[in-house]
Amino acid sequence: MKIGLYFGTFNPIHIGHLIIANHMAENSDLDQVWMVVTPHNPLKKKDTLLDDYQRLHLVNLATEDYPKLKPSDIEFKLPQPNYTVNTLAHLQDKFPSYEFSLIMGEDNLNSLHKWKNYEAILQNHQIYVYPRLNTDTIDNQFINHQKIHIIKAPIVEISSTFIRENIKNKKNIQPLLPPKVWKYIDHSNFYKK
């Protein structure tokens, strides 16, 4: 089974995340997309970052009607700080019959050379890349790489920061969130302070 890993803080998950994840699941050779919720770094203070399990719950709510999208808390169980290369190795050990790939935006691809052991990632895993606004061009060392697949996908520029700020300022952002996610956020009074 081919699994695409889509990492994020998902603070909160929004329709932009779902559009990209679902597009990758439906328009590539991936069988599933796992939405990997990245844990809070205890060394960094982040007033607006919800608890790891609250964010995971939001991802569960958002993906429950999408059979090819699965929430994942795999990084919660790994020593911190963690690196993507470690997560990939752990998953390959845990699920040896699965083929794991990364999903990332063009902006992240252009900084891939700064990632820990990025060469090992490229040697052992496919990378599916979606377009982003304000990304000039893809770095030449990656543009024709056999393990990198540029996927034509909708360009969705919605940010979780924008959503949090608008909730705090009592603006209506319901169209940007899956209905169950909005209901849970509103009921729990998240991001209002």
Swiss-Prot record:
GO molecular function, one term: nicotinate-nucleotide adenylyltransferase activity
Pfam families assigned: CTP_transf_like
Lineage of the species this protein comes from: Bacteria, Pseudomonadati, Bacteroidota, Flavobacteriia, Flavobacteriales
PANTHER family membership: NICOTINATE-NUCLEOTIDE ADENYLYLTRANSFERASE-RELATED, PHOSPHOPANTETHEINE ADENYLYLTRANSFERASE
Native organism: Flavobacterium psychrophilum (strain ATCC 49511 / DSM 21280 / CIP 103535 / JIP02/86)
Listed InterPro entries: Cyt_trans-like (IPR004821), NadD/NMNAT (IPR005248), Rossmann-like_a/b/a_fold (IPR014729)
Name of the protein in question: Probable nicotinate-nucleotide adenylyltransferase
Assigned keywords, A-Z: ATP-binding, NAD, Nucleotide-binding, Nucleotidyltransferase, Pyridine nucleotide biosynthesis, Transferase
Gene (name only): nadD
Endpoints of the signal sequence: none
NCBIfam families: cyt_tran_rel, nicotinate (nicotinamide) nucleotide adenylyltransferase
Family that this chain belongs to: Belongs to the NadD family.
Catalytic activity of the protein: nicotinate beta-D-ribonucleotide + ATP + H(+) = deamido-NAD(+) + diphosphate
EC number(s) on file: 2.7.7.18
Pathway membership: Cofactor biosynthesis; NAD(+) biosynthesis; deamido-NAD(+) from nicotinate D-ribonucleotide: step 1/1
GO process terms (BP): NAD biosynthetic process
